[in-house]
Amino acid sequence: HVEKDNPPQDLIDLNPSQSVPTLVDRELTLWESRIIMEYLDERFPHPPLMPVYPVARGESRLYMQRIEKDWYTLMNVIVNGSSSEADAARKQLREELLAIAPVFGQKPFFLSDEFSLVDCYLAPLLWRLPTLGVEFSGPGAKELKGYMTRVFERDSFLASLTEPEREMRLGRG
């Protein structure tokens, strides 16, 4: 765990933006979640988390960009904005996720029969929704909650959680 106002010296030395996550692999240092995720998928390609075909890979990258630009931006407003800004962002995030909820019911994972990097990108946001005060009911809630359950029950997802993340939903241990 890294405190934003007190980053460790090795992070300062490795990463000029001092952001987390930061990955060091041999002589390479990377930061920014999506860059790290794509690198790891290429470094450890079995099973692949990005589609094999270039068009599908491009579409996946667009989905991840949209998730970042639209939903992670709203999450940031919820966490760091004023009370009224947070309330508006919370409402917008809930409405946008419910609006695309049918997508979550079409296939086991995000527009795919296979777990993909898009799911990896979306999962941390969805995991934090209760902490952010975003809850679902009504049309679309069943599909969205079903998708979340499928992702959150994966051994790989559970193994990826830090202790603070685990405590967000699971309590201690």
Question: In which residue ranges do the predicted regions lie?
Answer:
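Poly-acidic low-complexity segments
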Residues: 1, 10, 15, 135, ...
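GST-like domain detector, emphasizing the conserved glutathione-binding G-site
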Residues: 1-102, 108
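Conserved residues at the C-terminal ends of beta-strands
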Residues: 26, 123, 163
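Hydrophobic alpha-helical segments
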Residues: 38-40, 46, 82, 130-133, ...
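GST-like fold's C-terminal all-alpha helical module
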Residues: 63, 67-160
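Acidic/histidine-enriched, glycine/proline-rich intrinsically disordered or flexible terminal extensions
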Residues: 163-173
